[in-house]
From Swiss-Prot:
Residues where ATP binds: G136, Q137, G138, S139, V140, D141
UniProt-listed NCBIfam families: PRK04439.1-3 (NF003364), PRK04439.1-5 (NF003366)
Naturally occurring in which organism (per UniProt): Thermoplasma volcanium (strain ATCC 51530 / DSM 4299 / JCM 9571 / NBRC 15438 / GSS1)
Protein name, per record: S-adenosylmethionine synthase
Gene transcribed to yield this protein: mat
Top-level EC class: transferase
Reaction(s) catalysed by this chain's protein: L-methionine + ATP + H2O = S-adenosyl-L-methionine + phosphate + diphosphate
Pfam families the record matches: AdoMet_Synthase
Gene Ontology biological process terms in this record: one-carbon metabolic process; S-adenosylmethionine biosynthetic process
The organism's place on the tree of life at top rank: Archaea
Amino acid sequence: MERNISVEELNQIPTPKKEVEIVERKGIGHPDSVADGIAEAVSRSLSKYYLEHYGRILHHNTDQVEVVGGQSAPKYGGGLVLEPTYILLSGRATTKVGNDRVPYKSITIKAAKDYLRNNFSHLDVDADVMIDSRIGQGSVDLVEVYDTSKLEANDTSFGVGFAPLSETENIVLKTERYLNGSLKKKLPMVGYDIKVMGFRQKDTINLTVAAAFVDKYIKDADEYFNLKDQLKDLVLDNAVEETDKEVKVYINTADIRENSKSVGYLTVTGMSMENGDDGSVGRGNRVNGLITPYRAMSMEAAAGKNPVTHVGKLYNVLANKIANDIVQEEGNDIAEVLVRIVSQIGRPIDDPHVASVQVIYEGNVDHSKHKNNIRNLVNDRLAHVSDLTMQFVEGKITVF
């Protein structure tokens, strides 16, 4: 197959060498990430049901999850959730196949509850959240189920990817994963709702961290502020392992500490959605786990989209995979790679309208020796785009 693949040199300063760089990551417990995680869990559960009962993944898009914040009264020693967070599941799913009815509501609600239970230990799923499935209904004829014709793009859209991650991007990503990972053994009172904003100016990296604390572990304001100081030191120690640049860390900068009044970031569940913070699918991290205003990005929401033909999901992940593979295989001659893949509705997903690769090279490099290699690599990855489908279903690929 002759695919439309463009490979060109990009003459600009690589992102890590620019004077200023801004990078953000919303942690797994941020309301936008909660919406993404639930949407993807629902899609996985529906996909598994369809595969088990009909041998293929049927049409669905569950990328319209809304998190509507509840009300809580946190306090030192332990507070209360006063009103549960409302979580709306919407989108579309195949709910009838021939004469068979798919139990889509029970599948989707169970998937959402299981996701919350498995990821947020301080959340009482039965009491602290209310889940409502309003997923739209659709049906297919049994003949359609077993139609194995070519898979075609269901939208005209584009995906974007880049590589490699800069030092600042890596630090932001690893900081959140550290705080929501191994740090929990040292400081279990640090909740899951964490946001990290990285700002590099020349050779100084600033990390501003918003971290919800769980109130039941903390007896008073003095202990809270002592724990916050410990957290700052741990974040700094973790970050300096990744860079020789100066790193400055700021934690919960809206806190107030005065003799007459102290205000800290306290929660009952470790999640700000308990107290009025809302979230939506696609409003947070891109598929590489970051928000990168100094890079090209797609605004497409990948979480919850069907993993078979929705190019908004497939092409964003594939573009990042291609970019990373180019950097890995072509070596130190490559400073930066930008990949864009454009679909056309009705066109085979392995034959996009165009796959564009722009390369920033290091120094005086013979571009010709890389151009054909890159073209062949892109051609191969496009030919195998459908390999991503089961990786999504099995949870091997994250999209936020």
